[in-house]
Amino acid sequence: MRFIQEFGYTVKIGQDEAHQKWVIANDAALRAASPAGSKYLGIYAVVFSSEKQAGFYKVLMELDSYGAMDKAAAAAKDPKGAWAKLIRESTQFTDLDLSAPWSNTLLRNVIDATIWDPKT
């Protein structure tokens, strides 16, 4: 199975440049620390979108199974793990106001998806 998980978020006002510098400095570390079954694809700035409340930045992760989400959750809880450290550090830029745009999407590759037409 192949999945892409997308986390959309908004950066606090006045923190976009610091956020970009942090991403540049930590991109390779995020890639290296990806939990088992997951591959960090990067953090992307939204150039244009029809979604108005989905966040202006997207973290994209490739997952090899549904179970990879459990492994990622466990890695995020490990106080000594590099993944947990980086994720916690990155939240300094996240606008946590409940009205701030955000999103969370799980995409499954069509090749692996169960798809059928309804009987008419």
Regions found by a protein language model. Give the residues of each.
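An amphipathic, aromatic/His-enriched active-site/gating alpha helix that lines ligand/cofactor pockets
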Residues: 25-41, 50-56, 60-110, 119-120
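Active-site-flanking beta-strand signature of metal-NTP-handling nucleotidyl enzymes
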Residues: 2-10, 58
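Alpha-helical scaffolding within the catalytic cores
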Residues: 44-46
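Intrinsic disorder/low-complexity detector
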Residues: 1, 116-118
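Short, solvent-exposed aromatic-acidic interface loops
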Residues: 4, 48-50
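Short acidic, gly/pro-rich beta-turn/loop elements at beta-sheet edges
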Residues: 17-19, 69-71, 114
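Short, surface-exposed ligand-recognition loops at beta-strand->loop->(often short) alpha-helix junctions
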Residues: 10-21
